[in-house]
Amino acid sequence: MTLIELCDNCKLPKSSTLRCRMNLEQARFNMVESQIRTWEVLDQTVLDLLLTIRREEFVPEKYRDLAFADLEIPLGHAEVMLAPKMEARMIQELDVRKTDKILEVGTGSGYVTALLAKLGGQVISVERVPEFSHAAMRRLAGHGLQNVQLHSGNAAEGWPTQAPYDVILLTGSVPLLSESFQQQLAIGGRLLAVIGESPVMTAYLVTRASANAFSSVGLFETSIPPLRDVKQPERFVF
């Protein structure tokens, strides 16, 4: 009996690898054109990056067929990969620059980490689930990204040991934004967080203008899973 090796991505025989790659690239192109452009992501640098970084390689194997679908993908431990359009919009709004020092709260699969690393100078990414950090480290190394520090820990109040940051991204929602995050921003730094409680949440961009001056702009309404271990606001009981 002759054993036929299957491609990890499409499950076709490896002899069909070229066809598999063409199918993947078409699916990636369709994701960008149909989902992401239509969600007001028009920055060409971001769009080109989404066509370059292979999202399917960051998706758990059993969900790989959904790598380009407009939905959240379960990672386990009550965490998800955000929908592609949400990831892209967050990246665009932060206007990441090559000199930026970036804090990512919630590494997850490592895909957004990879996008940030391609655009920025240095990325510090903190994840509460150690196995996610270990898996992300392997994936990022496979993409040749060496400007990332991965930490296992609780960054629900930020990561002050390496502050200040030019960019801070929270990949899960918070009911209220802790002031500690704002204090970890450099002057001119930008922070993006989805604030509120389901079903009503808003993505905000916070900019630090000076030592004591901050501006906040509501960007769009959405709903994403919460950041874990975040202090909940006090509630009145009548």
Task: Kindly give the residue locations of the regions a language model identified.
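Cysteine-centered motifs
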Residues: 7-10, 20
